[in-house]
Amino acid sequence: MKTLGEFIVEKQHEFSHATGELTALLSAIKLGAKIIHRDINKAGLVDILGASGAENVQGEVQQKLDLFANEKLKAALRARDIVAGIASEEEDEIVVFEGCEHAKYVVLMDPLDGSSNIDVNVSVGTIFSIYRRVTPVGTPVTEEDFLQPGNRQVAAGYVVYGSSTMLVYTTGCGVHAFTYDPSLGVFCLCQERMRFPEKGNTYSINEGNYIKFPQGVKKYIKYCQEEDKETQRPYTSRYIGSLVADFHRNLLKGGIYLYPSTASHPDGKLRLLYECNPMAFLAEQAGGKASDGKERILDIIPESLHQRRSFFVGNNHMVEDVENFIKAFPDA
């Protein structure tokens, strides 16, 4: 049995900037995940379910667990003195860690993706993305350090809190998964160099919004539902409502996750920096593809911290199919 800590140290030579700091940073995220795992499992007993009464910068009602997870992860990262600052879905602006001007890394995160599912005991997750800062070491970080394209990520991953808790990450040398053993308090390696299956047959989208989707996406959904033995259609529809949970299922079973633009969200709804980019990095490392329907996600130059984007991620052939439909059926 190999633990996450042992695996990271063993693979450190594959990382061109290996100094031990990234290992410590991932260890801090691991600690935060353990704390979140512990308290999610007793959320109904300690009054951290439901809405907090506050809204985040996007105007979304914050769940109590959103704020709880944000504070726990922030504290875990701050305590190690190896992160110069963070950006979070739950923070209006970047958080600069005073006294950590010497640190080389910044972290972007969605502390608890799908938190509205907690009340009904459905899987939720944590998403994180790690970059080397671009401003001089020794100075406070600025927003410039966070507004980098996804192709500059040095590591990314997620934690899915479900029937078991799993941490999945990449440093650009494959995707690896670890299952949490609560009796030992450690994450143990369960899958090394994960890959999307060669063919996917699942599409994950909130079809309740069908009438609001662009024409190309509507046509693709109908394509998925049509019978065709040669392409093994119709495909199966599976939608959990948590990006982490839907992505994780499709990574294991094969499929595509779709979150297109709508009239009310013309730029899409998912956040580019701390949702789309890390999942796109993982997808490509697992042999998949991620796009906004027209452009590779990892090549998009971000313009703002909480920028949104349409998002299509999964098996190569499925993402290419939806891109072709979007191109063939443009909205007037």
Swiss-Prot record:
<feature type="binding site">
    <location>
        <position position="112"/>
    </location>
    <ligand>
        <name>Mg(2+) 1</name>
    </ligand>
</feature>
<keyword id="KW-0460">Magnesium</keyword>
<comment type="pathway">
    <text>Carbohydrate biosynthesis; gluconeogenesis.</text>
</comment>
<feature type="binding site">
    <location>
        <position position="113"/>
    </location>
    <ligand>
        <name>Mg(2+) 2</name>
    </ligand>
</feature>
<keyword id="KW-0963">Cytoplasm</keyword>
<keyword id="KW-0119">Carbohydrate metabolism</keyword>
<keyword id="KW-0479">Metal-binding</keyword>
<comment type="similarity">
    <text>Belongs to the FBPase class 1 family.</text>
</comment>
<feature type="binding site">
    <location>
        <position position="110"/>
    </location>
    <ligand>
        <name>Mg(2+) 1</name>
    </ligand>
</feature>
<dbReference type="GO" id="GO:0006094">
    <property type="term" value="P:gluconeogenesis"/>
</dbReference>
<dbReference type="InterPro" id="IPR044015">
    <property type="entry name" value="FBPase_C_dom"/>
</dbReference>
<dbReference type="GO" id="GO:0005986">
    <property type="term" value="P:sucrose biosynthetic process"/>
</dbReference>
<dbReference type="InterPro" id="IPR033391">
    <property type="entry name" value="FBPase_N"/>
</dbReference>
<feature type="binding site">
    <location>
        <position position="275"/>
    </location>
    <ligand>
        <name>Mg(2+) 2</name>
    </ligand>
</feature>
<protein>
    <recommendedName>
        <fullName>Fructose-1,6-bisphosphatase class 1</fullName>
        <ecNumber>3.1.3.11</ecNumber>
    </recommendedName>
</protein>
<keyword id="KW-0378">Hydrolase</keyword>
<dbReference type="GO" id="GO:0006002">
    <property type="term" value="P:fructose 6-phosphate metabolic process"/>
</dbReference>
<feature type="binding site">
    <location>
        <begin position="257"/>
        <end position="259"/>
    </location>
    <ligand>
        <name>substrate</name>
    </ligand>
</feature>
<dbReference type="Pfam" id="PF18913">
    <property type="entry name" value="FBPase_C"/>
</dbReference>
<comment type="subunit">
    <text>Homotetramer.</text>
</comment>
<dbReference type="GO" id="GO:0042132">
    <property type="term" value="F:fructose 1,6-bisphosphate 1-phosphatase activity"/>
</dbReference>
<feature type="binding site">
    <location>
        <position position="269"/>
    </location>
    <ligand>
        <name>substrate</name>
    </ligand>
</feature>
<dbReference type="GO" id="GO:0000287">
    <property type="term" value="F:magnesium ion binding"/>
</dbReference>
<dbReference type="Pfam" id="PF00316">
    <property type="entry name" value="FBPase"/>
</dbReference>
<dbReference type="InterPro" id="IPR028343">
    <property type="entry name" value="FBPtase"/>
</dbReference>
<dbReference type="InterPro" id="IPR020548">
    <property type="entry name" value="Fructose_bisphosphatase_AS"/>
</dbReference>
<feature type="binding site">
    <location>
        <position position="89"/>
    </location>
    <ligand>
        <name>Mg(2+) 1</name>
    </ligand>
</feature>
<dbReference type="GO" id="GO:0030388">
    <property type="term" value="P:fructose 1,6-bisphosphate metabolic process"/>
</dbReference>
<feature type="binding site">
    <location>
        <position position="239"/>
    </location>
    <ligand>
        <name>substrate</name>
    </ligand>
</feature>
<feature type="binding site">
    <location>
        <position position="110"/>
    </location>
    <ligand>
        <name>Mg(2+) 2</name>
    </ligand>
</feature>
<feature type="binding site">
    <location>
        <begin position="113"/>
        <end position="116"/>
    </location>
    <ligand>
        <name>substrate</name>
    </ligand>
</feature>
<dbReference type="GO" id="GO:0006000">
    <property type="term" value="P:fructose metabolic process"/>
</dbReference>
<dbReference type="GO" id="GO:0005829">
    <property type="term" value="C:cytosol"/>
</dbReference>
<feature type="binding site">
    <location>
        <position position="206"/>
    </location>
    <ligand>
        <name>substrate</name>
    </ligand>
</feature>
<dbReference type="InterPro" id="IPR000146">
    <property type="entry name" value="FBPase_class-1"/>
</dbReference>
